[in-house]
């Protein structure tokens, strides 16, 4: 009997420094632990979240706190980053994916520069849904002031392509909710209201339900059987007998999967998340190479030019010591391979300093299989100097 698991959704708190993201994270876990049973519901204190351990993602060190909570219908994994730079790095590297974000805005300040920056980044990196928590409403007794702040947030969300008029805005106070020790009371109810808003968000399509895609890491020739490519299946399912394409670096080749292997066992199929070997019909070892992808027919194409949002590492993070200018030519590590390319900076931007995040245009030397939302590393001589996400395919 397989235990039915609750559908899972990844959320995170975003917003300006000191608007209460971490306090809200603590309040969410605390109120839910008191209100709802469920082994995922444990109260997490502010200090535990604030002293988040550092972790490495794509060669970049990021402090991120991970907490979890659940309702009757869903299980939530929630990320909160202590520092503003950590947010930018987290969103660009995808260290902690977010299906949805809780935008925290202080009722006393309204929208601030980082509020805007986080909304824009959320849009760029493909966060589909946002709900708003207007915090510190206990210290604003002017109803008109609250309405103005709410209106301003809605307009800002619309400006960046979110449905500002329809998004749920919950007015509350994370501090007051934490003070209500029983988990019931007017401010705790606001936390439950926020949870109800999260419950309405549509669940993300699981990777397994998308068309098949696998990045090729290695190629072997097995005498008497043919050519096997290995790699991690990124999305979808592959079955023996499926038609597939080999895309990137060269012209597209069509073939058929004649075998799927994992841990030296032959299987009927492989699915998203599996590290598998795929046997290819009629393909010679020299016809395929690391850096190409296997894909369901017609699902992915190779391109050389794209726009991206990137974060450039600081010197202390092991990045460059000096700025770079337009036409800088590093390697772009895309899926499983390094490809040289050149960077064009936006008009009016002379140079990029270590520690900056910026929108750029990239022209690669060779076409590779890419799609919008794909993350990559920028490398120089094998070390990571930056990280990025593709926001638009050009050609």
Curated annotation (Swiss-Prot):
Q: Which molecular function terms from Gene Ontology are attached? A: GTP binding; GTPase activity; guanosine tetraphosphate binding; translation elongation factor activity
- InterPro entries, sorted: EF-Tu_GTP-bd (IPR041709), EF-Tu_GTPase (IPR050055), EFTu-like_2 (IPR004161), EFTU_2 (IPR033720), G_TR_CS (IPR031157), P-loop_NTPase (IPR027417), Small_GTP-bd (IPR005225), T_Tr_GTP-bd_dom (IPR000795)
| Database matches in PROSITE patterns | G_TR_1 (PS00301), G_TR_2 (PS51722)
Enumerate the spans annotated as tr-type G domain. Answer: 6-205
Protein biosynthesis as a keyword of this entry, yes or no, is yes
Q: Name the residues that bind GTP.
A: 15-22, 80-84, 135-138
* Catalysed reaction, written as an equation: GTP + H2O = GDP + phosphate + H(+)
Alphabetized, the UniProt keywords read: Cytoplasm, Elongation factor, GTP-binding, Hydrolase, Magnesium, Metal-binding, Nucleotide-binding, Protein biosynthesis
Q: What class of enzyme is it?
A: hydrolase
**Which residues are listed for Mg(2+) binding in this entry?**
22
Please give the residue ranges the record annotates as the region G2: 59-63
Is Protein biosynthesis a UniProt keyword of this protein? yes
Catalytic activity, EC: 3.6.5.3
Q: Which CDD domains match?
A: EF_Tu (cd01884), EFTU_II (cd03697), EFTU_III (cd03707)
Task: Note the Gene3D superfamilies from the entry.
Answer: P-loop containing nucleotide triphosphate hydrolases, Translation factors
Summarizing the function annotation, the protein's role is: GTP hydrolase that promotes the GTP-dependent binding of aminoacyl-tRNA to the A-site of ribosomes during protein biosynthesis.
Q: What is this protein called?
A: Elongation factor Tu
User: Which organism's genome codes for this protein?
Assistant: Ehrlichia chaffeensis (strain ATCC CRL-10679 / Arkansas)
């Amino acid at each position: 009997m397989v235990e039915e698991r609750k559908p899972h959704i990844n959320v995170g708190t975003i917003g300006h420094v000191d608007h209460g993201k971490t306090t809200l994270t603590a309040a969410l876990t605390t109120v839910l632990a008191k209100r709802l049973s469920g082994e995922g519901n444990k109260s997490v204190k502010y200090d535990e979240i604030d002293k988040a351990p550092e972790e490495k993602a794509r060669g970049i060190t990021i402090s991120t706190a991970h907490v979890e909570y659940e309702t009757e219908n869903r299980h939530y994994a929630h990320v909160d980053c202590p520092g503003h730079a950590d947010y930018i790095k987290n969103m660009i590297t995808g260290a902690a994916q977010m299906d949805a974000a809780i935008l925290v805005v202080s009722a006393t300040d309204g929208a601030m520069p980082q509020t805007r920056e986080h909304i824009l980044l959320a849009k760029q990196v493909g966060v589909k849904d946002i709900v708003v928590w207007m915090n510190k409403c206990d210290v604003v007794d002017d109803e008109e002031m609250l309405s103005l702040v709410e209106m301003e947030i809605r307009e800002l969300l619309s400006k960046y392509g979110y449905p500002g008029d329809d998004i749920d805005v919950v007015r509350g106070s994370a501090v007051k909710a934490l003070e209500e020790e029983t988990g019931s009371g007017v401010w705790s109810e606001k936390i439950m209201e926020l949870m109800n808003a999260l419950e309405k968000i549509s669940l993300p399509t699981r990777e397994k339900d998308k068309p098949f895609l696998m990045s090729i890491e290695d190629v072997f020739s097995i005498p008497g059987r043919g050519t096997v490519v290995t790699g991690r299946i990124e999305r979808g399912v592959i079955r023996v007998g499926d038609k597939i394409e080999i895309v990137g670096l060269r012209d597209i080749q069509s073939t058929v999967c004649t075998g799927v292997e994992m841990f030296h066992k032959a299987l009927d199929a492989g699915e998203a998340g599996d590290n598998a070997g795929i046997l290819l019909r009629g393909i010679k070892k020299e016809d395929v190479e690391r850096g190409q992808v296997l894909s369901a027919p017609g699902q992915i194409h190779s391109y050389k030019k794209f726009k991206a949002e990137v974060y450039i590492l600081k010197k202390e993070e092991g990045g460059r010591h000096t700025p770079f200018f337009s036409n800088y030519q590093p390697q772009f590590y895309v899926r499983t391979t390094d490809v040289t390319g050149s960077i064009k900076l936006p008009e009016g931007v002379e140079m990029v300093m270590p520690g900056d995040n910026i929108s750029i245009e990239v022209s690669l030397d060779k076409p590779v299989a890419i799609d919008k939302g794909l993350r990559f590393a920028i490398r120089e001589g094998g070390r990571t100097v930056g990280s990025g996400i593709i926001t638009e395919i050009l050609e």
